[in-house]
Amino acid sequence: MSVEITLYTKKSTKTGLIKFLSANNFKKARHFIDEMNTPERIGFMWFEYDNYESTTGVEATVIKISEEDRYKYNCSDWILHTRTRASGSFEDKQKQNEIIKTARQQFGGTLYNDWYGTNKYTNLDDYRKFSALEKGISIIANGSLEKLSQIRNCLNDYRNEMSETLANIKPESMRTMLVSIDPSIVLYNSLMPFLVSVIEYFFGQIFANYIKYHESSRRMLAEEKVKIEISDVISILKSEDSLEQIVMKSYNFQNLDSINKAFKKYTSIDINETLSQKKKVSGKIIRVLTNLEAILNARHKFVHELDIDYCLSKEKYLVNVSTVEKAIELTIQRIKKDGLNIEIEH
């Protein structure tokens, strides 16, 4: 649920509230509705990127209220309105409480919380606090699934006049002979690298988050003798890269054996075993690992040899999309067995 807390300040000015927010790491931000950006409504945003603390951040607006409302609430001309979205993290809600509490100490006044009432702060016990690892995995998994959903939505409505003409040619022998000029088949083949990018991102970034945030994975990394190039050391010192990302790059996350090796070593998760299960995908029982390997091989042949699979239809490509989705689902289920709370929105 989104939470809005308004502080009807007793003694504040526009300049004072702006300086206050800036001093507390709020940055000026424009509202996405242009009409809301006026001299009487100055928007700010707080967002903490480190350790996935924020998911949506805290919105704050310095507002000049009407004379009628000023008398109604017995407050200053300028008030402070804050909002956290429904999907906001525990830390976002916590920051919202803190900024209103600090502002009230400085400017006085009465606060109204649209969920908890007058002079009531948000009860943080109503919100689950996730670890950095849990939030990181949730963000990575949901981001991966969202991209797969987007490509499915695009293809569901995709039509090509030439492809439809070729599909209706008779006899079948003639249609088979002309399949090489079907533009849709080239399109579906060219989208295979997209699926591999999702696979690489999902497994690679989850691995990097484990060795950054998971205690036993970090301990193992600390005991590891890893050779690091001087250029990588400089990148770390400049905060242009991290040790976790450099270690991640030492594995090939477009290769299932390499993925399995990395996960087994640092997380004790056997990816091959996890994905070897037989599951129903698009109405058929498949071994997910086998189909995932076929996707990786198809991408390799297309990229390096321009090998076109002329049997790859829209339906078959969408089965591949579902296969990657199932691989993500099975991996998250395995991670949850270790006691991690992962929120999947799809």
Across the structure, where does each feature detected by a protein language model lie?
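Amphipathic, Lys/Arg-enriched alpha-helical patches that create a basic surface
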Residues: 268-303, 312-346
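Short, surface-exposed loop/turn segments at secondary-structure junctions
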Residues: 181-185, 310-315
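Helix-loop junctions and short alpha-helical segments
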Residues: 121-292
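Short, intrinsically disordered low-complexity segments
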Residues: 24-88
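Hydrophobic/aromatic-lined pockets within catalytic cores
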Residues: 108, 199-203, 207, 211-215, ...
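Short, extreme N-terminal segment that most often corresponds to the first beta-strand
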Residues: 1-36
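Charged, non-catalytic interaction/linker regions at domain boundaries
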Residues: 75-135
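Short, conserved charged micro-motifs
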Residues: 12-21, 90-96, 310
